[in-house]
Amino acid sequence: MEINGFKLKYSAEELTKKVNNEVREICLIDKNEKEYVDLTDGDKKALDYLVNAAKIMNDVALELDHPLNLIQKQALETLAPGNEYVSNALLLFNFINGVAGYNGLDKDPVEIFEGIHMYKGCNFYPTDLDENEFHEIIIKMLDENKVDEVAKILSSRTVVRRKGDVLEAIDYTEYFSEEFSEIANEIECAAHFTTDNMFKEYLKWQAQALLQNNVEMDILADKHWVKMQNTSLEFTISRENYNDKMTPSVFSNKSLIERLRGVNINPVPKDMLGIRVGIVNKQGTNLLLKFKDKMRELVNKMPCSELYEQKISDGELKQTMVDVDIVALSGDYAMCRGGITLAQNLPNNDKPSLYRGGGRRNVYHRQVRFAGDSEKTKKILINIILKF
């Protein structure tokens, strides 16, 4: 069966096997559960707006990941009703959140359509750009003293497109100006309704960061986010840069990376974007904070603790920790290609807020944790401990 000229790669039997046996279902929290019911009316309204923001961001991430993601998803959604074959293809698409992606088990990626493959530079870069040409263009632009343009190309927050015989970088806030404006509007509405003043303040900064081509706004939003320890709701715009394999390729070109360092350009892989929305679970969070207080004692009880250097500082840990009931995961969070994280510690080392005095925030995903096979995990842990 062809969809937009591309044939589904798997047979009906193969698709059924994949969606029934090769995935794990994770049920997120809904409005019928106590955690939601106990929220204030204002926070309930805020949550709805934040979920809307997450849905819009998912389309942004799909665009960044592959140029055919959106059009193929729309076609699958149109054809799926009443068609089990296409419905299973759509399920597989939603599991990996894209037309192709690794499953963490097989050497080759899962590809839903024949002829649609993953790209080294995802859709951050022109899909017909290979590594050699990329390096040649960067060298040419450096020769022409286009240092500022090269710095933008190798930035984490730009989409790169061809412009004649060179490349042009477009900041995310400009490339996705319409989508970011819609997301910012949803966030501002959430800020209006939430009853938590600290959360309200953070949302306002985060909305502004989406509207301005200014990394300083991201820094301010990050700094407000990491301080939140006692809020009722959780909202994160994730910026992870593991998908982009094109930008890091410059590090393998010794002469090129030396030239870049000579003009103070530090290449950073492109950020894949995602949104997490949740309700902070007070009981789970209190337990985490007890662990935090006992951190220095716990590290000495780890297996073979004497064999490695401890990184725990003597002062107060500059980190907030929350256990969260997940309401929505979109974009990069939903690209479960090989697994889905149990917790996330942000910002990452490449983010300016971290070396500008900001701390980190560790968010634990309760529904992901509960979806695991506890007996299997217990056996694995026991076997690991017995080895020591």
Model-derived segments and spans:
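Catalytic Zn2+-binding segment of zinc metalloproteases
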Residues: 388
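Contiguous, non-catalytic segments that form substrate-binding/exosite surfaces or channel walls
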Residues: 175-385
